[in-house]
């Protein structure tokens, strides 16, 4: 009788363990993810020229794909089951089919490309070649270059306005932004901005653009209707990222130089609130309802949640070493953080009153950028 009771106890414990495991798995599975749908993250690894594909339900790597030397600029095509990226050393764009985790195209784009953007409908990709001072437009269906254009010296990124009517290119060595026709890449104007312009944020109504300076404490405000520079705003430290509120009303700018977050009113073009966050805030991700901004602190090794509406800083969340790029999954269930120095992807349960780290998923060597795809 005693042996039978022990067996029953073992069976009961195993059953409870399996039940608990199932509950945890269900808890981590996003509510919108129906059977047959997949949710994956793709992380480019700069030191080994690969991309790590990570299943966000299993929270485990499922493939390592060779893409070429110095991968950068990884983006999810909004209209196709594809991840696009660049080989800066190879001078080409690569296309990854997410259903097979195989590279299906390599498209020459010019020397030293760093960033890639899509048209609003996902039909075209735009790449600026920093080493050739050129811009190309790629038809995403045929995967062929369909237009060439000239940029200024050492262009960084080509960004399309939300209305699809202009292509903006930041030219670092010229301290200008080029305006091009997004179909033909014919020139439409050149506007002077602050030194070494890099990142670009554009208001939802396509009326203004904001550009970071890579070497000063300024951001430039450009009127896209009149095509003139409105102002160069001093922030107190070099801007590291541009996060635009969905309604376009505010711009959030992490700055390692100020150890904090600068808020800019995009209607008045004035620097507003400042929040002290940590050692070296760099990148950020904003929830869809614009209530919480998650800011990565590279030197501190954590993520700082900010209740942005009330300007309240919450307790930091420890992740891996050198957290930088961060992005929320569709639905906002998880925040993914690329840990550049510990070679992993931090997964944070973001939709709780107190967000917490779930796990660290291994990546390749020296990960940099991140893309998320639901398919």
Segments predicted by a language model, with ranges:
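Predominantly soluble domains enriched in secretory-pathway, periplasmic, or organellar proteins
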Residues: 2-375
């Amino acid at each position: 009788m005693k042996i039978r009771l022990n067996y029953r106890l073992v069976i009961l414990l195993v059953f409870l363990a399996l039940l608990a495991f199932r509950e945890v798995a269900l808890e981590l599975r996003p509510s919108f993810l129906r059977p047959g749908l997949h949710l994956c993250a793709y992380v480019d690894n700069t030191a080994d020229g690969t991309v790590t594909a990570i299943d966000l339900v299993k929270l485990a790597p499922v493939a390592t794909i060779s893409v070429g030397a110095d991968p950068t600029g990884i983006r999810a095509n909004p209209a196709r089951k594809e991840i696009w990226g660049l080989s800066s050393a190879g001078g080409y764009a690569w296309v990854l089919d997410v259903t097979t985790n195989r590279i299906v195209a390599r498209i020459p784009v010019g020397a030293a490309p760093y960033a890639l953007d899509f048209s609003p409908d996902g039909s075209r990709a735009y790449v600026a070649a920093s080493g050739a001072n050129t811009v190309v437009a790629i038809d995403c269906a045929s995967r062929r270059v369909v237009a060439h254009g000239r940029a200024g010296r050492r262009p960084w990124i080509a960004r399309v306005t939300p209305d699809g009517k202009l292509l903006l290119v930041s030219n670092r060595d010229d301290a200008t932004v080029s305006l091009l026709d997004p179909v033909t890449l014919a020139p439409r104007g050149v506007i002077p901005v602050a030194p070494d312009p890099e990142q670009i944020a554009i208001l939802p109504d396509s009326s203004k653009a904001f550009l970071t300076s890579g070497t000063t404490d300024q951001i430039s405000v450009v009127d896209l209707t009149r095509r003139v520079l409105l102002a160069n705003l001093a922030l107190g430290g070099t801007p590291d990222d541009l996060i635009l509120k969905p309604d376009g009303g505010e711009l959030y700018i992490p700055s390692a130089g100020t150890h904090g977050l600068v808020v800019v009113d995009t209607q008045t073009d004035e620097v507003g609130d400042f929040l002290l966050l940590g050692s070296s805030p760099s990148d950020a991700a904003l929830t869809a309802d614009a209530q919480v901004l998650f800011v990565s602190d590279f030197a501190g090794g954590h993520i700082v949640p900010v209740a942005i509406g009330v300007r309240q800083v919450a307790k930091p969340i420890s992740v891996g070493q050198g957290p930088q790029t961060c992005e929320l999954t569709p639905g906002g269930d998880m925040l993914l953080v690329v840990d550049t120095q510990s070679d992993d992807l931090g997964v944070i349960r973001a939709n709780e009153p107190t967000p917490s780290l779930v796990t660290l998923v291994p990546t390749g060597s020296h990960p940099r950028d991140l893309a998320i795809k639901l398919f």
